[in-house]
Amino acid sequence: MISAERVLALAARRGLDAQDLLPEFVREAQKLAIPPTSRFHVGAAALGASGAVYLGVNVELPGLPLNASIHAEQFAVVTAMRAGERALEAIATTAAPCGHCRQFMNELRGAASMRVIIPDGDVGGDRKSHLVLPLCDLLPHSFGPLDLTHDDSLPLLLEERHNGLRFAPGSIPEGSGAAELDRAAAVALAEANAAYAPYSASPAGLVLVDSDGVVHAGRSVESAAYNPTMSPLHTALVAAVGSAGMGDANGGEWRRIESATLVEMNGAPVRYAGTAALILETIAPRASLRVIACEKVA
Protein backbone atom coordinates (compact mmCIF):
# COMPACT_ATOMS: atom_id res chain seq x y z
CA MET A 1 0.00 0.00 0.00
CA ILE A 2 1.13 3.55 -0.75
CA SER A 3 -0.30 5.95 1.80
CA ALA A 4 -2.61 8.79 0.80
CA GLU A 5 -0.08 11.27 2.19
CA ARG A 6 2.73 9.92 0.03
CA VAL A 7 0.53 9.79 -3.07
CA LEU A 8 -0.59 13.39 -2.47
CA ALA A 9 3.00 14.56 -2.00
CA LEU A 10 4.19 12.81 -5.17
CA ALA A 11 1.32 14.21 -7.19
CA ALA A 12 1.86 17.77 -5.89
CA ARG A 13 5.60 17.61 -6.56
CA ARG A 14 4.95 16.74 -10.20
CA GLY A 15 1.82 18.79 -10.78
CA LEU A 16 -0.31 15.72 -11.45
CA ASP A 17 -3.52 14.18 -10.18
CA ALA A 18 -3.20 11.03 -8.09
CA GLN A 19 -4.80 9.04 -10.92
CA ASP A 20 -2.00 10.12 -13.27
CA LEU A 21 0.56 8.33 -11.09
CA LEU A 22 -1.12 4.93 -11.30
CA PRO A 23 0.60 3.72 -14.52
CA GLU A 24 4.00 4.38 -12.91
CA PHE A 25 3.01 2.38 -9.85
CA VAL A 26 1.90 -0.41 -12.18
CA ARG A 27 5.35 -0.62 -13.74
CA GLU A 28 6.95 -0.95 -10.31
CA ALA A 29 4.44 -3.56 -9.18
CA GLN A 30 4.95 -5.55 -12.38
CA LYS A 31 8.53 -6.32 -11.32
CA LEU A 32 7.20 -8.18 -8.26
CA ALA A 33 4.84 -10.52 -10.14
CA ILE A 34 5.19 -14.29 -9.65
CA PRO A 35 4.31 -15.95 -12.99
CA PRO A 36 6.37 -19.19 -13.17
CA THR A 37 4.08 -20.68 -15.82
CA SER A 38 3.24 -17.85 -18.20
CA ARG A 39 6.33 -15.70 -17.59
CA PHE A 40 3.94 -12.79 -18.22
CA HIS A 41 4.34 -10.18 -15.50
CA VAL A 42 1.21 -8.21 -14.66
CA GLY A 43 0.90 -5.27 -12.29
CA ALA A 44 -2.09 -3.30 -11.06
CA ALA A 45 -2.53 -0.14 -8.99
CA ALA A 46 -5.90 0.82 -7.52
CA LEU A 47 -6.74 4.29 -6.18
CA GLY A 48 -8.94 4.20 -3.10
CA ALA A 49 -11.47 6.82 -2.07
CA SER A 50 -9.15 7.50 0.88
CA GLY A 51 -6.40 8.57 -1.53
CA ALA A 52 -4.23 5.53 -0.83
CA VAL A 53 -2.99 3.30 -3.66
CA TYR A 54 -3.05 -0.49 -3.50
CA LEU A 55 -0.72 -2.56 -5.66
CA GLY A 56 -1.38 -5.96 -7.16
CA VAL A 57 0.55 -8.61 -9.07
CA ASN A 58 -0.32 -11.88 -10.76
CA VAL A 59 0.62 -15.00 -8.78
CA GLU A 60 0.79 -18.42 -10.45
CA LEU A 61 1.18 -21.56 -8.36
CA PRO A 62 3.58 -24.14 -9.87
CA GLY A 63 2.20 -27.64 -10.25
CA LEU A 64 -1.43 -26.53 -10.03
CA PRO A 65 -4.10 -25.83 -12.68
CA LEU A 66 -4.12 -22.41 -14.28
CA ASN A 67 -7.39 -21.51 -12.57
CA ALA A 68 -5.57 -21.64 -9.22
CA SER A 69 -3.81 -18.40 -10.19
CA ILE A 70 -4.37 -15.01 -8.57
CA HIS A 71 -4.88 -12.12 -11.00
CA ALA A 72 -3.21 -8.75 -10.41
CA GLU A 73 -6.52 -6.89 -10.25
CA GLN A 74 -7.84 -9.38 -7.70
CA PHE A 75 -4.66 -8.94 -5.69
CA ALA A 76 -5.06 -5.14 -5.65
CA VAL A 77 -8.74 -5.29 -4.63
CA VAL A 78 -8.01 -7.80 -1.84
CA THR A 79 -5.13 -5.63 -0.60
CA ALA A 80 -7.53 -2.67 -0.44
CA MET A 81 -10.04 -4.84 1.42
CA ARG A 82 -7.43 -5.88 3.97
CA ALA A 83 -6.50 -2.23 4.57
CA GLY A 84 -10.12 -1.31 5.31
CA GLU A 85 -10.62 0.72 2.13
CA ARG A 86 -14.35 1.13 1.43
CA ALA A 87 -14.34 2.18 -2.24
CA LEU A 88 -12.08 2.29 -5.29
CA GLU A 89 -12.13 5.16 -7.75
CA ALA A 90 -9.71 3.94 -10.42
CA ILE A 91 -7.43 1.06 -11.31
CA ALA A 92 -4.52 0.93 -13.76
CA THR A 93 -3.18 -2.31 -15.20
CA THR A 94 -0.36 -3.61 -17.38
CA ALA A 95 -2.87 -4.52 -20.10
CA ALA A 96 -6.63 -4.44 -20.47
CA PRO A 97 -8.15 -6.54 -17.65
CA CYS A 98 -9.28 -10.01 -18.67
CA GLY A 99 -12.97 -10.85 -18.51
CA HIS A 100 -12.40 -12.72 -15.24
CA CYS A 101 -11.12 -9.55 -13.55
CA ARG A 102 -13.74 -7.28 -15.07
CA GLN A 103 -16.36 -9.55 -13.55
CA PHE A 104 -14.55 -9.65 -10.18
CA MET A 105 -14.40 -5.85 -9.99
CA ASN A 106 -18.11 -5.71 -10.77
CA GLU A 107 -18.72 -6.70 -7.13
CA LEU A 108 -17.81 -3.15 -6.04
CA ARG A 109 -20.52 -0.59 -5.44
CA GLY A 110 -20.49 1.91 -8.28
CA ALA A 111 -18.32 -0.46 -10.31
CA ALA A 112 -19.82 0.73 -13.59
CA SER A 113 -18.25 4.18 -13.17
CA MET A 114 -14.90 3.05 -11.76
CA ARG A 115 -12.15 4.28 -14.08
CA VAL A 116 -9.92 1.66 -15.71
CA ILE A 117 -6.59 2.91 -17.07
CA ILE A 118 -4.92 0.79 -19.75
CA PRO A 119 -2.00 1.31 -22.18
CA ASP A 120 -2.83 2.72 -25.60
CA GLY A 121 0.39 2.63 -27.61
CA ASP A 122 3.97 3.87 -27.17
CA VAL A 123 4.87 7.55 -26.94
CA GLY A 124 8.63 7.06 -26.84
CA GLY A 125 11.05 5.02 -24.77
CA ASP A 126 9.29 3.11 -22.02
CA ARG A 127 6.47 5.63 -21.85
CA LYS A 128 2.99 4.82 -23.08
CA SER A 129 -0.16 6.77 -23.66
CA HIS A 130 -3.19 5.52 -21.79
CA LEU A 131 -6.90 5.12 -22.22
CA VAL A 132 -9.21 5.90 -19.31
CA LEU A 133 -12.52 4.05 -19.54
CA PRO A 134 -15.36 3.37 -17.12
CA LEU A 135 -15.67 -0.31 -16.26
CA CYS A 136 -19.11 -0.38 -17.89
CA ASP A 137 -17.42 0.20 -21.27
CA LEU A 138 -15.32 -2.93 -20.70
CA LEU A 139 -18.21 -4.94 -19.26
CA PRO A 140 -21.38 -3.90 -21.12
CA HIS A 141 -24.74 -5.42 -20.19
CA SER A 142 -23.07 -6.80 -17.09
CA PHE A 143 -24.27 -9.49 -14.72
CA GLY A 144 -23.68 -8.45 -11.12
CA PRO A 145 -24.72 -8.63 -7.48
CA LEU A 146 -28.25 -7.31 -7.92
CA ASP A 147 -29.01 -9.95 -10.54
CA LEU A 148 -28.68 -12.61 -7.83
CA THR A 149 -29.55 -10.85 -4.58
CA HIS A 150 -32.20 -8.34 -5.78
CA ASP A 151 -31.36 -6.33 -2.66
CA ASP A 152 -29.51 -3.02 -3.00
CA SER A 153 -29.19 -2.70 0.78
CA LEU A 154 -26.80 -5.64 1.15
CA PRO A 155 -23.16 -4.65 1.70
CA LEU A 156 -20.99 -5.23 -1.37
CA LEU A 157 -17.30 -6.01 -1.69
CA LEU A 158 -15.14 -3.66 0.46
CA GLU A 159 -18.15 -2.59 2.50
CA GLU A 160 -18.36 -3.47 6.19
CA ARG A 161 -20.16 -6.68 7.08
CA HIS A 162 -20.43 -9.14 9.97
CA ASN A 163 -21.71 -12.62 9.28
CA GLY A 164 -22.68 -13.44 12.88
CA LEU A 165 -20.59 -16.59 13.27
CA ARG A 166 -19.21 -18.40 16.30
CA PHE A 167 -17.30 -21.63 16.80
CA ALA A 168 -19.60 -24.65 16.71
CA PRO A 169 -19.91 -26.42 20.08
CA GLY A 170 -17.08 -28.90 20.54
CA SER A 171 -15.15 -27.66 17.51
CA ILE A 172 -12.23 -26.56 19.69
CA PRO A 173 -11.85 -28.99 22.62
CA GLU A 174 -10.23 -27.59 25.75
CA GLY A 175 -6.48 -27.96 25.66
CA SER A 176 -6.67 -28.69 21.95
CA GLY A 177 -3.28 -27.28 21.07
CA ALA A 178 -0.64 -24.62 21.43
CA ALA A 179 -1.57 -21.00 22.06
CA GLU A 180 -0.42 -20.15 18.53
CA LEU A 181 -3.00 -22.51 17.02
CA ASP A 182 -5.75 -21.09 19.22
CA ARG A 183 -4.77 -17.58 18.13
CA ALA A 184 -4.89 -18.68 14.51
CA ALA A 185 -8.39 -20.09 15.04
CA ALA A 186 -9.61 -16.81 16.53
CA VAL A 187 -8.21 -14.82 13.62
CA ALA A 188 -9.70 -17.25 11.10
CA LEU A 189 -13.12 -16.86 12.74
CA ALA A 190 -12.81 -13.07 12.52
CA GLU A 191 -12.00 -13.44 8.83
CA ALA A 192 -15.02 -15.68 8.29
CA ASN A 193 -17.20 -13.06 9.97
CA ALA A 194 -15.93 -10.45 7.50
CA ALA A 195 -16.06 -12.74 4.45
CA TYR A 196 -17.98 -11.65 1.35
CA ALA A 197 -20.28 -14.56 0.58
CA PRO A 198 -23.68 -13.14 -0.44
CA TYR A 199 -24.44 -15.83 -3.03
CA SER A 200 -23.68 -19.12 -1.27
CA ALA A 201 -24.09 -18.01 2.36
CA SER A 202 -20.88 -19.98 2.98
CA PRO A 203 -18.44 -17.51 4.57
CA ALA A 204 -15.03 -18.89 5.48
CA GLY A 205 -11.75 -17.64 6.91
CA LEU A 206 -8.25 -19.08 6.83
CA VAL A 207 -4.98 -18.29 8.56
CA LEU A 208 -1.49 -19.29 7.45
CA VAL A 209 1.38 -19.30 9.93
CA ASP A 210 4.88 -19.20 8.47
CA SER A 211 8.24 -20.35 9.81
CA ASP A 212 8.76 -16.98 11.51
CA GLY A 213 5.44 -17.28 13.34
CA VAL A 214 3.86 -14.55 11.22
CA VAL A 215 0.12 -14.84 10.62
CA HIS A 216 -1.33 -14.27 7.14
CA ALA A 217 -5.13 -14.14 7.13
CA GLY A 218 -7.67 -14.49 4.34
CA ARG A 219 -11.41 -14.75 3.77
CA SER A 220 -13.68 -15.96 1.00
CA VAL A 221 -14.62 -13.33 -1.59
CA GLU A 222 -17.42 -14.36 -3.93
CA SER A 223 -18.39 -13.23 -7.42
CA ALA A 224 -21.87 -13.24 -8.91
CA ALA A 225 -20.31 -15.12 -11.83
CA TYR A 226 -19.02 -17.77 -9.37
CA ASN A 227 -15.75 -18.72 -11.11
CA PRO A 228 -13.89 -15.46 -10.28
CA THR A 229 -14.57 -16.17 -6.57
CA MET A 230 -11.44 -16.23 -4.39
CA SER A 231 -11.06 -18.90 -1.72
CA PRO A 232 -9.88 -17.89 1.76
CA LEU A 233 -6.57 -19.60 1.02
CA HIS A 234 -6.05 -17.44 -2.06
CA THR A 235 -6.70 -14.22 -0.17
CA ALA A 236 -4.35 -15.43 2.60
CA LEU A 237 -1.68 -16.00 -0.06
CA VAL A 238 -2.22 -12.39 -1.18
CA ALA A 239 -1.50 -11.32 2.40
CA ALA A 240 1.61 -13.53 2.52
CA VAL A 241 3.02 -12.10 -0.70
CA GLY A 242 2.15 -8.54 0.24
CA SER A 243 3.45 -8.50 3.81
CA ALA A 244 6.23 -11.09 3.81
CA GLY A 245 7.36 -11.24 0.20
CA MET A 246 6.45 -14.91 0.09
CA GLY A 247 6.35 -16.73 -3.23
CA ASP A 248 8.91 -17.02 -6.02
CA ALA A 249 9.19 -18.36 -9.54
CA ASN A 250 10.38 -21.75 -8.31
CA GLY A 251 7.79 -22.07 -5.56
CA GLY A 252 10.38 -22.58 -2.82
CA GLU A 253 9.18 -19.65 -0.73
CA TRP A 254 5.75 -21.22 -0.22
CA ARG A 255 7.44 -23.93 1.84
CA ARG A 256 7.80 -21.37 4.62
CA ILE A 257 4.12 -22.03 5.37
CA GLU A 258 3.98 -24.32 8.41
CA SER A 259 0.29 -24.48 9.24
CA ALA A 260 -3.14 -23.47 7.99
CA THR A 261 -6.31 -23.08 10.03
CA LEU A 262 -9.60 -22.96 8.14
CA VAL A 263 -12.90 -21.95 9.72
CA GLU A 264 -16.02 -22.76 7.71
CA MET A 265 -19.67 -23.48 8.42
CA ASN A 266 -21.06 -26.90 9.20
CA GLY A 267 -23.12 -28.12 6.26
CA ALA A 268 -22.36 -25.08 4.10
CA PRO A 269 -23.24 -25.44 0.39
CA VAL A 270 -19.68 -24.36 -0.46
CA ARG A 271 -16.71 -25.88 1.36
CA TYR A 272 -13.06 -24.93 1.01
CA ALA A 273 -11.25 -27.68 2.95
CA GLY A 274 -10.68 -29.91 -0.08
CA THR A 275 -9.32 -27.12 -2.26
CA ALA A 276 -7.07 -25.85 0.52
CA ALA A 277 -5.68 -29.35 1.12
CA LEU A 278 -4.93 -29.83 -2.59
CA ILE A 279 -3.15 -26.50 -2.96
CA LEU A 280 -1.15 -26.80 0.25
CA GLU A 281 -0.10 -30.36 -0.56
CA THR A 282 1.44 -29.01 -3.75
CA ILE A 283 3.03 -25.72 -2.67
CA ALA A 284 3.72 -26.38 1.03
CA PRO A 285 3.68 -30.17 1.52
CA ARG A 286 4.89 -30.01 5.13
CA ALA A 287 2.16 -27.61 6.24
CA SER A 288 -0.59 -28.96 8.48
CA LEU A 289 -4.24 -28.10 7.81
CA ARG A 290 -6.77 -27.84 10.63
CA VAL A 291 -10.47 -27.38 9.79
CA ILE A 292 -12.75 -25.91 12.46
CA ALA A 293 -16.53 -25.71 12.21
CA CYS A 294 -18.48 -22.54 12.87
CA GLU A 295 -22.18 -21.77 12.98
CA LYS A 296 -24.56 -18.82 12.86
CA VAL A 297 -25.31 -17.19 16.17
CA ALA A 298 -28.95 -17.93 16.94
PLM region spans:
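Zinc-dependent deaminase catalytic domain
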Residues: 1-298
